[in-house]
Each structure stands twice: as structure tokens, then as C-alpha cells.
Swiss-Prot record:
The keyword Transmembrane helix applies. The chain crosses the membrane at residues 36-56, 69-89, 107-127, 150-170, 197-217, 400-420, 434-454. This is Probable G-protein coupled receptor 101. It is a multi-pass membrane protein. It comes from Homo sapiens. Signal peptide: none annotated.
Length: 508
């Protein structure tokens, strides 16, 4: 690289050293942008951690063993953003470092202390969740309050052992004027670099992947079991609905048959009575008809016409009954058709949607899977094969695990990669300044991610946070004095009455 100093500059300013372009400090605009983004991250992290800490402190029942680990994680983040981050923001201004190199070493050690404490806590949380899900019966006896506190103390003790070697000579820290950052000189001590990288990302990633892989498999099996149980309950429900509809249809048919038989008997009796009456009338007329046979014959013909008309009327009534029977049969068929349609669109209520867990939901495809299609061959209809497990049962656990691991790698992965790269490459001159700035942002981004990943994704904690924010921002207004005009003591209740005031009682 060429030097920024010319011969004339060297002669006139012999006391100033020449600085190559590769070691030029960051510009003022670069420093302002870095500081602004850091301040935004720190403000978001401060608010998120404080709100979550207040929720955990307000509800003592939430401070179980697992949530105590989460609370310890919040403490490490708050210490990081309150004791370390302000100095990082201050040093982002070009050519500004107010203190000596010893303070720089102490600042790097303090940064690593809180970072290692955070990493160790995340590892403990992973193991704790593994034990609580895979061994739920023995978990209370294994993870007692005493062991929980011992693990918390252990995270800080191990973090102190991991972060303090630069203070007694194992590793070296200095202020990087080019990148405006107080950082480790990783190439000066490769052994400490290897120890830091293994402690930062290798061991934690192995533990997290191992624990959460087993947890994911267990969650998948549990969801599959719950899905099969719900599927069986849906089958039973469909069968019960069909049986009830069939029973109601059979009862309606029996009632209709009884009514039709009763009507037929009643009509037969009526016709028999009418025939008897007509026979009596005919005999009377025959006795009285000595004057002429023509009248009796005419009357006989009239009786026959009456009988024919009654027969036609009875036939019409029978046709009407048959028509009503057909209408009722059509209505029964329509009811059966509705029953068959309803089998494919069962209305699932809240009790059906929740079975042991809140996330078990059945879509229309799942409900249709309960009904075996009639078009399939009998070999497939009688098979015991279950429908494939819906994706929603697997994506929930996979999403949570992915967010946990990805956020961890995103925050500390670039920092560890830079440390390994510094063993072979001169980071101060070869790595672009914007890359260093992005790595700094990602390093402090974990303080913003931890409250969301380990706090707000928990349903109980999320509900408590929402309740607290509602009480804080939506305060209930006190009732007005005239809201109850009929009660004594209010303006409406004291109208037209003399009520002595406090002043009149104490002063003449």
C-alpha cells in the first residue's frame, strides 16, 4: 500500500509518522452510523429485558427453576448493555480513546465475562428443557431449587475462568485505531483463541443441537399421538351422529305407519255406518213404495251413485295419503343427504379444538380424512393406515428450535469466525471496516433477541406482559359523581335537601 505522506510532508512534519491507507481510521460518518445503530439496539434491549424482568418479579409463581435461568440471562444482558456497550459507543468516534491500554484489557475481559455467562446460561436452559420434556416424572427430583442455584453460580464461576486470562497475560487486548474498537489481538495467543472459540460456539452448539433434537422428536411423537386420539374421537362422533339420525328416521316412519293404519280403520268404520244408514233408508223406502216401483228404482240408482261417489272420494283420500307419504319419504331422504354432507363439515368447537395442548387444530382436510371414501376399494377402506400427520404439528416445534439455534449462531458466529481468521490474517488491515461494524452489531443484537426467544415466546409470560401493559397504558377511569343519581350522597340524591358540609361542621 502507498503511504499518505509525501517527501515535502516528511521534511516539514518530521515529528508526525506516516499512516498507510490500510490503517486509516474510520470516517466520522461511519462512526455516527455505528453509534446510532448501537444506541437503537441498546434501547430495545433495555426495554425488553426490563419489562420481562418486571413480569417475572411481579409473579412469584413464574420464578420456577427454568425461569430463574431466564432471569439470569436477562441480568447478563442488562449488565452487558449498561457497563460495556456505552464504551463501545464512545470509542466509535474516530481517534477517540480516553483511557490507557490496561483499561482496554479490563473492558475486553468484562465483555467476555458477560458473554460467557450468557452462553453458559443458554446451555443450562437447553439441558433443563431436555430434562423437563424427556423425563417429566423424575424432573422435580433432579432439578431442585438447590441444584438450580448451584447451576446459576456455576455459570458465573465458569465465565470468570473463561474471561480473565487476558488479565494475567494469557491473551492480549489493545485498542484498534483503524476500526475504533477495543478488542482482542487473537493472533498473539492462538491457544486462548481456540479456548474462546470452543467455549463460545463449539460446545454450546453441540449441546443445544443434541438436546433440542431429542426434544423435537419427542414433540413430534406427542403430537402424532394426540392427532390419532383426536382422529378417533372424530370418528366416534361421526358414527354417533349417523346412528342418531337413523334412529330418528326409523321413529318417524313408525309414527307415520301407525297414523295411516288408524286413519284407514276410522274411514272403514265411517263407510260401514254410511252403508247401514243407506240400507235402512232403502228398506223404508221399499216398504213405503207400494204406490210405484219406478220411484224405488230411481232411489236405488241414486244410492248406487252415492256409493260410487263415496268410493271415488275414498280413492282420492288414498291418493292424497300416498302423496303425503311420498313427500315425507322425500323429506327423509333430504335429511339423510344433509347428514351425509354434515359428515364432511363438522363444526368443531373450542373444546374439540383443544386436547391437552393449545396448538392442536384440525382443518377441513383432517376432518375429511376421518370419513373413508366409498369410491376406494375395500382393501384400502379396511386398512388400518392412518392419514399423514399435518404439517402444523411439526412446524411449531421446528420453528422454535430453529429460532433459538439460528439467533445464537447469528450473534456469536461471526465474532468467532473473525477470531479464527485473525490467527492467519491481519484483521486490522485486511478485513473491511464495515464488516467489523456489522460483527459488532450482531454481537450486541443477542441482547435484543434473548427476551423474545426465551420470554415472549412463552404463552404464560406473554399473557402476563399483555396484562401489565394494558394496566399501564389503559388505566380505568374512576366513576363520575353523577353516575348514580338515585344514591344518597350524590348530586341527584341530595337535590332539594340540605346536607351539612365539612366546613360548616368545623367552622361557625
Amino acid at each position: 500500500m502507498t503511504s499518505t505522506c509525501t517527501n515535502s510532508t516528511r521534511e516539514s512534519n518530521s515529528s508526525h509518522t506516516c499512516m498507510p491507507l490500510s490503517k486509516m481510521p474510520i470516517s466520522l460518518a461511519h462512526g455516527i452510523i455505528r453509534s446510532t445503530v448501537l444506541v437503537i439496539f441498546l434501547a430495545a434491549s433495555f426495554v425488553g429485558n426490563i419489562v420481562l424482568a418486571l413480569v417475572l418479579q411481579r409473579k412469584p409463581q413464574l420464578l420456577q427453576v427454568t425461569n430463574r435461568f431466564i432471569f439470569n440471562l436477562l441480568v447478563t444482558d442488562l449488565l452487558q448493555i449498561s457497563l460495556v456497550a456505552p464504551w463501545v459507543v464512545a470509542t466509535s468516534v474516530p481517534l477517540f480513546w480516553p483511557l490507557n491500554s490496561h483499561f482496554c484489557t479490563a473492558l475486553v475481559s468484562l465483555t467476555h465475562l458477560f458473554a460467557f455467562a450468557s452462553v453458559n446460561t443458554i446451555v443450562v436452559v437447553s439441558v433443563d428443557r431436555y430434562l423437563s420434556i424427556i423425563h417429566p416424572l423424575s424432573y422435580p427430583s433432579k432439578m431442585t431449587q438447590r441444584r438450580g442455584y448451584l447451576l446459576l453460580y456455576g455459570t458465573w464461576i465458569v465465565a470468570i475462568l473463561q474471561s480473565t486470562p487476558p488479565l494475567y497475560g494469557w491473551g492480549q487486548a489493545a485498542f484498534d485505531e483503524r476500526n475504533a474498537l477495543c478488542s482482542m489481538i487473537w493472533g498473539a495467543s492462538p491457544s486462548y483463541t481456540i479456548l474462546s472459540v470452543v467455549s463460545f460456539i463449539v460446545i454450546p452448539l453441540i449441546v443445544m443441537i443434541a438436546c433440542y433434537s431429542v426434544v423435537f422428536c419427542a414433540a413430534r411423537r406427542q403430537h402424532a399421538l394426540l392427532y390419532n386420539v383426536k382422529r378417533h374421537s372424530l370418528e366416534v362422533r361421526v358414527k354417533d351422529c349417523v346412528e342418531n339420525e337413523d334412529e330418528e328416521g326409523a321413529e318417524k316412519k313408525e309414527e307415520f305407519q301407525d297414523e295411516s293404519e288408524f286413519r284407514r280403520q276410522h274411514e272403514g268404520e265411517v263407510k260401514a255406518k254410511e252403508g247401514r244408514m243407506e240400507a235402512k233408508d232403502g228398506s223404508l223406502k221399499a216398504k213405503e213404495g207400494s204406490t210405484g216401483t219406478s220411484e224405488s228404482s230411481v232411489e236405488a240408482r241414486g244410492s248406487e251413485e252415492v256409493r260410487e261417489s263415496s268410493t271415488v272420494a275414498s280413492d282420492g283420500s288414498m291418493e292424497g295419503k300416498e302423496g303425503s307419504t311420498k313427500v315425507e319419504e322425500n323429506s327423509m331422504k333430504a335429511d339423510k343427504g344433509r347428514t351425509e354432507v354434515n359428515q364432511c363439515s363438522i363444526d368443531l368447537g373450542e373444546d374439540d379444538m383443544e386436547f391437552g395442548e393449545d396448538d392442536i387444530n384440525f382443518s377441513e382436510d383432517d376432518v375429511e380424512a376421518v370419513n373413508i371414501p366409498e369410491s376406494l376399494p375395500p382393501s384400502r377402506r379396511n386398512s388400518n393406515s392412518n392419514p399423514p400427520l399435518p404439517r402444523c404439528y411439526q412446524c411449531k416445534a421446528a420453528k422454535v428450535i430453529f429460532i433459538i439455534i439460528f439467533s445464537y449462531v447469528l450473534s456469536l458466529g461471526p465474532y468467532c469466525f473473525l477470531a479464527v481468521l485473525a490467527v492467519w490474517v491481519d484483521v486490522e488491515t485486511q478485513v473491511p471496516q464495515w464488516v467489523i461494524t456489522i460483527i459488532i452489531w450482531l454481537f450486541f443484537l443477542q441482547c435484543c433477541i434473548h427476551p423474545y426467544v426465551y420470554g415472549y415466546m412463552h404463552k404464560t409470560i406473554k399473557k402476563e406482559i399483555q396484562d401489565m401493559l394494558k394496566k399501564f397504558f389503559c388505566k380505568e377511569k374512576p366513576p363520575k359523581e353523577d353516575s348514580h343519581p338515585d344514591l344518597p350522597g350524590t348530586e341527584g340524591g341530595t337535590e332539594g335537601k340540605i346536607v351539612p358540609s365539612y366546613d360548616s361542621a368545623t367552622f361557625p
